[in-house]
Structures are given as C-alpha cells and as structure tokens.
Amino acid sequence: MENKIFSVAEISQIFKEAIEGSNYFKNIYVRGEVGNLTFNKSGHVYFSLKDNQSTIAAMIWKSNAHKLTNLNVKEGMEITCYGRLTYYVPSGRVSFEAVDVSVEGKGDLQEIFEERLKEITALGWTDESRKKPINRFAKNIGLITTDSGAAIKDLITTLKRRMPSVNIYLFPTMVQGETAKFDIANKIQQANLFEPKLDILIVGRGGGSYEDLWTFNEMKVLKAIVDSSIPVISAVGHEPDITLSDYVADLRAATPTAAAELASISTEELLKELAYNYENQIRLFKNVYNNQQLKIEEFKKQNILKINNKYDLQSLDLNYIEKSFINNINNIISRNEMFIENIESKTALLDPKKPLDKGFGLIMSKDKQIINSVDKVDINQEIKLVLKDGEIETIIKGVKKHGK
C-alpha cells in the first residue's frame, strides 16, 4: 500500500477541522497572564496568555472588546477568558478566540467601582455642597440618551403630560460600547453651549446588565457631569441600579420616568403648593395680628397704671396707634393679594386650552393623535379641528410646506 502524502494545505485543513470541529475546544475557560497587548485600529484586541510553562495567542473581536477595556486590563494582569480554540491555516497557528473576560483579584468590575468611588470622593465630586438645585418650573429641558427605546419615550411622555408648556431638546448618544463614554461627554458639553439656555439636563438610559451600564461609571462621563453648569439629573437603569453618575449628578432618579417627574411639576402639585403657601400666609397674618393685639392691650394696661399714679399725664392718642396698626394690616393684606394674583397668572399659563381663546385650534386625526406637521397628513384624510367651543370635522384637500 502506497503511503499517503499530504500537502501543507491539506494537513493544515485537517488540523483546523479537528480543532474547530471538536466540542472539546468550544465553550472553554483559559486563565493566564496578559502579554503583548495590542489594540488594533480596527477595534479588535490581540494579546497572549501565558503561565510558567506555555504561551498561547489570543484575540477578542471588536464586538466584545469593551468587555476587556472596561476592566482596564493591562499587561502582567491575570485574567480568565471564555471562548474557543481556532486554527489559522495561513500561519498554522492555534489561537484562543475570547468572547468574555474576567479579571482575577482586584481587577473585577465591583472593585474598580469601589476604587473609583473613593477617587471621586477624594476629588470632592460627590459633595452635596457643590450640587445645584433643580428648577421644577423649567422651560427648557435637555435629554441625553439614545434616540430609540423605552427610555426616551417614557421621558417625553411624562414631561409633556405633567408640564405641557415645556420645551424638550434631545441630544442623541450611544449609551454602551467602547466609544459611548466619549459620545456622552461630548453631548453634555454641547448641551451646555446650546441656545436657548437649558434649565435641566437628564442623562441616562433604560435598564441593562451591570456591564451594559458601565459607561456611566467612566471618568470621562463623570467629569463632564461635574463640569456642567446646567443641573444634571442622573437616570440610569432601574431602581436597584447604582452608577457613579448617580453620585456626582445634582440629583439621582431611580428610572428615566422618575427623572421626568423630578424635573417637572404637575398642575395638581402646583395647586397643592399654592394652597400650602396661601395657608402659610394666612397663618402669618393671624400671628402678626394677634401679636399686635397683645401689644395694644399691654400698652393700654401700662398707660392706665400711669394715669392712675400720675394725674398730670396727658392722654395718649390711642386712635393714632390703632390707625397705624390698621395700616400695617392693610399693607400685609395687599402684599398677600399681589402674591396670590402672581401665582394665579402663572397657573393660567399652564392651561393647554388657553390658546384656544385667542382663535388658535388643535388639529387631531380621527384616532385623536395630535397633528403638528404637514408630514403627518395625507390628501383626503379626515381630521378634526378642536376650537374653544366645539369641534369641526374636515378633509385635507391639499398640503403646502413652508419654503417649498
């Protein structure tokens, strides 16, 4: 029988099929010391894993590279990689393709979190004294989050429901991945230069894994929040999720919806606040009045004693004192009336139906969706015009866009 002679390509292909086709080399963990760490411009990361006896080449593709960079992995650190063995035919080299990474010892995410918290605390970034108050009567609110998903919808819906007059400006950004920290920091800086001037910034995202939320623990993002001249509300994830952004922001919200509620005041809350202030003013008025009455009675008693003891004491003009007291009371009442009128005028501005009294109308589709652009209507579409005293049903005959 003639001996089989293999070409180099054939034997390499046999090796490849044997290694990559075997379940034994899939879904395995390899632990070793990091060496030859290279961050390729393509986004892939190449390195080696070694111990006292051997070395193996390893790589992690761009899609999973953040799992390594988030851990601040450096050469000499011991890590555990999860993945599979591969065989590269052109060079005849066996490599380990990692899809996940964990760091041994002090390098895991939780310890990095705790060390970074100590660092920002020492810098004074978490001090309550440096945090700015939140204006709940904000006119302009900026949202720094992704432009898709439940978080942005919840934010806009809640803000508009509670405070219809508010202006909302979205600064869309990546919220996870290797470059997300730079994107978020840049958007915070852009928002601080934006015109009209913003009253509040809400920075955050919806829920995700601990690793998904890690961007909001990055120093680049934390520094941008601290440097913001606009008050920042941190709204990352769900109730149990805590990030370092929560520590440095001016206010922490458990969820994006909660952030919208903290950034606004509803009509019901406003009326309660007005009632509370009114009751305080009445209480103050009564206290002033009662104190003045006590002073008058005490004054009368003292002067009666003087008159009884000294017959030559001239009568005091109590009418003058009473007139002065009445003038003081009238001044207090006038100030309270001006305060209440001012509050009532601000409350009227929050009424979404007020513009209808001036001849404006609200355009709605048949399914009661508000139409605010010609792009949202079609020819022959039935629509409703809501006026202050009723509704008009009509049909679109033509559409003309401004500037065209």
Curated annotation (Swiss-Prot):
GO terms for biological process: DNA catabolic process. It is found in: Cytoplasm. The keyword Nuclease applies. Its EC number is 3.1.11.6. GO terms for cellular component: cytoplasm; exodeoxyribonuclease VII complex. It catalyses: Exonucleolytic cleavage in either 5'- to 3'- or 3'- to 5'-direction to yield nucleoside 5'-phosphates. Keywords: Cytoplasm, Exonuclease, Hydrolase, Nuclease. GO terms for molecular function: exodeoxyribonuclease VII activity; nucleic acid binding. InterPro entries: Exonuc_VII_L, Exonuc_VII_lsu_C, OB-fold_nuc-bd_dom. PANTHER family: EXODEOXYRIBONUCLEASE 7 LARGE SUBUNIT. Belongs to the XseA family. Heterooligomer composed of large and small subunits. Bidirectionally degrades single-stranded DNA into large acid-insoluble oligonucleotides, which are then degraded further into small acid-soluble oligonucleotides. This is Exodeoxyribonuclease 7 large subunit. The lineage of its organism: Bacteria, Bacillati, Mycoplasmatota, Mollicutes, Entomoplasmatales.
